[in-house]
Amino acid sequence: MQMETIALPKICVGRRRLYLAQVPIPFSKKSRRNVVRQTSDNGEQTRKSTRVKLRPQKDWHKRNYLAEVLIPSLFVKRAGEYTPPEFPVIEPGQVCITWIGHASFLIQTHELNILIDPIWSKWLKVVKRLKKPGFEIHHLPDIDVVLVTHAHFDHLDRRTLRKVAADQPIVVPIGVGNLVHDLGFQIVHELDYWQGIKVGPVEVSLTPCYHWGARFLADLHRGFGGFAMNIDGRTIFHCGDTAFFPGFREIGEHHHIDIALLPIGAYDAPTGREVHMNPEEAVRAFQELNAKTLIPMHYGTFRLGYEPMHEPLERLVVAARAHGIEQKLMVLTEGKPVVL
């Protein structure tokens, strides 16, 4: 696996950090000069297609997402409370994980703060957020690097990214850089599957998944994936969005996952397509990864499928018990840091 190293000397300006990343900038186009795309050893891109079929399933139109889910959600009171987080002091060898909500996580080590798929917005265009983030965005610590798994609106929220950008690096899949290059990040790194980058002491690698990356209708060129983060000898895996696919076993063999952040919601999709794992498939993926701890995500925040908001977690607990992994399941509360 390729690994590029970024040195991150820091200059503190108030609570904002400036990062002097020692990385060449190979593009001359001024508006996107901060986008760096890593290539394979022979200079070619190594993208492999693991895109789901985008054609809706038969009879999908017989259900009405607008009438059954979207409009009723507008009248649901947004749940949750903003609570100032109590971030602990992280000792060497420890890692602190804070679930913010949906697929957003703050990963902290004693040297680095990593923010993944951050979204604080109350709306995804017309889809209402039904659960508040665990804390307000100004309670975030200084962020050293941001990771975005793909360009879908519930994972790449430009409004949130603009607020957290403070001249630090951001890492995205191939083809996503032009969506974030103008938001205030010092450098944008585009990765292909199995490519990696070293940010300070943490190794970050892009892993395959079974999904798609278009933000609109015609931009199917955009990449998508998950991130494996090697932190002090332990690997945390953020799956991104995915349906179940055979690649989980390969990811587990390649990265030796300790903590798996796996999506469990939005499986009853409006189009009928299988684009997200259900809770039972998440348990199966966890077993294929041969991971040690399962932390569920991508549920309870936005109602992106027909299933009730409470159903994914209830089904996950039942499935975990049925497969004998209940002790490996760790359900987080939004905004509550957990040290592992």
Tell what function each PLM region has.
Residues 72-92, 172-234, 314-340:
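Metallo-beta-lactamase
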Residues 96-99, 113-117, 203-209, 235-241:
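Active-site-proximal beta-strand elements of phosphoester/diester hydrolases
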Residues 76-92, 100, 104-151, 158-163, ...:
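Pre-active-site segment of Zn-dependent metallo-hydrolases
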Residues 94-96, 164-170, 234-236:
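Short active-site oxyanion
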Residues 8-113, 336:
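Zn-dependent metallo-beta-lactamase
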Residues 118-121, 150-151, 209-210, 240-242, ...:
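Active-site metal-binding loops of divalent metal-dependent hydrolases
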